[in-house]
Amino acid sequence: VNYRNHRKLCVIDGRVGFIGGMNIALRYVKGTARHAWRDTHLRVEGGVVYAIQRAFLIDWYFVDRTLITNRKYYPPMPAMPDTGTMAQVVMASPMMPWPEIMQGYVRILMEARSYVFMQTPYFMPTDPVLFALSTAAKAGVDVRLMLPRHADAFFTDWASRSFVSQVVEAGVKVFLYQEGFLHSKMLVCDDRVCTCGSTNIDF
């Protein structure tokens, strides 16, 4: 199961990219009879689109062993205003020797000074992430975690409860989204760092 592709990427003409938590199906837009669906997806332009396309092409080669070399798939990037904002695409895979995304979360939490707000549909953190969450909260950082009130899978709902209890005891403020199923995977820290993608906190 962990070898399936969980990425949700879209690149249009090599110029516009979409990345985040949304799957491609009507129920992920309109919800189901059981509950509405809440998600976060980003539309991006500029050099980061190349990085999203590279992630797709690596997956494509892994499956098909075909290199996409036609220049039409790599158009020149149009001039963009300098916003002073940096964007980076970080990938994770069971094939990779180092858990980059998990390590990124740990570093953000350990370097936070004011606040860290997080959303995830599934909360089964590794020991390093659990330690970083607890340490940040105990150090006075305003750590807030938003989860769905009801998970879409019974097992994950029950599995996450013991972890929730641990972080609440450490001072993390946990909020339960009531208006449907929260599928968003997002983190915001100190008005300076934001992450958005398809990685749940169940590394």
Cite the ranges covered by each PLM segment:
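Charged, low-complexity intrinsically disordered terminal segments
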Residues: V1-F203
